[in-house]
Amino acid sequence: MSEPSAAVGQRPGGESAPAHRLWGGRFTAGPAESVAALSRSIDVDWRLARYDLRASKAHARVLAAAGLLDADELAQLLAALDELDRACASGTFQPAAADEDVHTALERALLERLGPLGGKLRAGRSRNDQIATDLRLYLRDHVRLLVRRLVDLQWALVDQAERHLDLPAPGMTHLQHAQPVLFAHHLLAHVAAFARDVDRFRDWDRRAAICPLGAGALAGSSLPLDPHAVAAELGFTAPAANSIDAVSDRDFAAEFAFAAALVGVHLSRLGEEIVLWCSQEFGWVELDDAYATGSSIMPQKKNPDVAELARGKAGRLIGNLTSLLTMLKGLPLAYDRDLQEDKFPVFDSLDTLLLVLPAMTGLVATMRVKADRVAAAAPAGFSLATDVAEALVRRGVPFHEAHQAVGRLVAWCAAHGTDLSAVDDDQLAEISPYFTPENRAEVRTVLSVRGAIGARAAYGGTAPERVAEQLAAVRAALADSAAWADAAP
C-alpha cells in the first residue's frame, strides 16, 4: 500500500494525476472543459470526505456479508479506508484539481492504493445514495455542535438574569413603555426562543436519522445487501422505506435551513435590542471592549458590531432557505443534478451560525448592565396604567369602564405634566366616579413598580416567584439539551 500523496493532484513522483471519472464507458470523449468546470463540486463537498469514508466502511462490510468480498479483500479495503481517513484528517491527502467531487477523489485514492480491488466498493451503490447519506451524517453531527453553541448562549443569558434577579425594567410593546417587568424575565424570553430552536433541531434529527444508503441510483439494488445493517452501523434509526424518495429527498436539508434561519431571526432580535440598549439614548448596558469595535475617523466611538453583524446575517440565512426551496420546487423524481446545489446554502448556514453564536455568547456574557439606568426607566411612560385598571377590576368595576377611567387619568397626568402616583385623592375623584375611597386604596397598592411586578403572579408572569420558577425549569432543560448535544448520534 503506497503512502498518500503529499501534493494536491500529484503522484509521489510529481507527475500530474490523470482525470478519474466514475462514469464514461459509453462516451467516446471526456466532457468539455466548461462542462467539467460547471460539474465540479469538490471545493464544496470535500468537507464530507470523512463521512463518505465512514459510509464506505459500512458498505464494505455488507458487501462481504453478501459474499461479494472475501475476508482478505474486506480486510484490505478497511485498512485502506482507515489509512485514507487518517490522511484526510491530517490533510496529507487532498483532492486533485481534476477530481469532480468527493466520491471521485476518494475512489481514485483507493484505486491508487489497491488497484482493481478498490473498484469493488462501488458495487451496489450510486453517488445518488452516497451523497444523501454523507450529507445526513455530516449534518447530524454538526447539528449537535450547533445545539451546544445555542446552549452556551442560553447559559450566558441565564447568568445575566441571575445577576439581576430583582432589577425592574420597562416592558415594551411597539418600542413604547408598556408595563414594568423584571429584567431577568425579559432575558428569559430570549432563552425561550433559543430553547425552541434547540427543540426544532432535536426534532429535525429524528427525521434525518433515516439512511438512504442501499437505494442505489433510485431503484434499490439487485445485490443481496442488507440496508438495515448499514443503517445501524452508521447510527441511523432505519433505512429509507422507499428508494426513490431516499435519493430525491432533501426535506432534511430544507428543514435544517429553516431551523437555521429562525435561529438567525432570534439572534437578530437579540442583537437589535443590544444595539438599542448600548446607545446613548438607552444607556442600559456597556459592552466589553473585546466585543466592540471603534471607528476609523471618530475616536470616541464604541460600536456594537457583533450585534449588528448577527442582525445582518439573518438576511443571509433567510436567503439560503429561499435558495434551497426555490431549487427544490420543480424537480421531478428521482435524482436531478440540481441537487448538487443543496450543499452551498446548507453549509453556508451552518458555517454562519457557528461563526455568530460564540461571538454573541461572549457579547452577552461580558456586557455590563447599568442597573440604575434600567430601574429608573421602569415607571416611565405611565407604565402602571394597566395595573390601576386591574385594581379597579378587582374592586368589581367592569374592565371597559376601568379602561376608560384610567385612560382619562393618563390624559389628565399628561396634560398636567405629572405621574400617576402624584395624583391626590380629590383629583382622582374628579377624574372618574369609579375612584371611590375604597377603590383609591386598592389603586394606591399598585402605584409602585415593585407592587406592579409582584402582582403579576400568574403562571409565566413577571412576579419574582414566577421568574424563579422559570429559571429552575430553564436550568433543567439546558442540562438535558447539553447532554443530547454531547452524545453521538
UniProtKB/Swiss-Prot annotation:
Keyword Transmembrane found: no
Gene encoding the protein: argH
Protein name according to UniProt: Argininosuccinate lyase
PROSITE patterns per record: FUMARATE_LYASES
Listed EC numbers: 4.3.2.1
GO annotation, cellular component aspect: cytosol
Pathway the protein takes part in: Amino-acid biosynthesis; L-arginine biosynthesis; L-arginine from L-ornithine and carbamoyl phosphate: step 3/3
Top-rank taxon, per record: Bacteria
InterPro entries hit by this protein: Arg_succ_lyase_C, Argininosuccinate_lyase, Fumarase/histidase_N, Fumarate_lyase_CS, Fumarate_lyase_fam, Fumarate_lyase_N, L-Aspartase-like
Region (Disordered): 1-20
Record keywords, A-Z: Amino-acid biosynthesis, Arginine biosynthesis, Cytoplasm, Lyase
Reaction catalysed by this enzyme: 2-(N(omega)-L-arginino)succinate = fumarate + L-arginine
PANTHER family in alphabetical order: ARGININOSUCCINATE LYASE
UniProt source species: Acidothermus cellulolyticus (strain ATCC 43068 / DSM 8971 / 11B)
Family: Belongs to the lyase 1 family. Argininosuccinate lyase subfamily.
Lineage: Bacteria, Bacillati, Actinomycetota, Actinomycetes, Acidothermales
Subcellular compartments: Cytoplasm
